[in-house]
Amino acid sequence: MAKLEQHLTGDFGQIVEFIHQELMRQSMSISLEECSKNQIQGKRIELRVYERFSYAGGNRTSLTVQFIETKDGADVCGIATGGSQAVFWKINTLGESAFLETLDVAIRAWNSTGHA
């Protein structure tokens, strides 16, 4: 399992859509499996679960991305899971790391557009 947390500044809805589009653009096999939208104490929260085939690991991996609205943007947390092999310990976690890297690339792209 691999995790990435980052605060992004800008419009919450634009952040969510931009990250989604960047993730979809980076992989031919990626799909948005499920999405949940809620509001708690006036703050929007969106949870998205993506899945893709990992050529690096030769298996399927998932990436869960949570967006929590803040005063000036969104707190983003991405957790990649799956793709490891073996029963009692994790080996071959290449797919998880590679999938999480796509989120990192998307976040850097958002920041490079002048929103950081």
Report residues per predicted region.
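A conserved amphipathic terminal alpha-helix motif
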Residues: 86-116
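Short, Lys/Arg-enriched charge-dense amphipathic segments
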Residues: 4-5, 51-64, 99-105
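Hydrophobic transmembrane alpha-helix bundles
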Residues: 25-32, 66-78, 103-105, 115-116
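Terminal, regulation- and interaction-focused segments at domain boundaries
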Residues: 1-27, 108, 112, 116
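Ser/Thr-rich, low-complexity intrinsically disordered terminal regions
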Residues: 17-63, 71
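Beta-strand/loop substructures that line and gate deep hydrophobic ligand-binding cavities in soluble
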Residues: 57-91
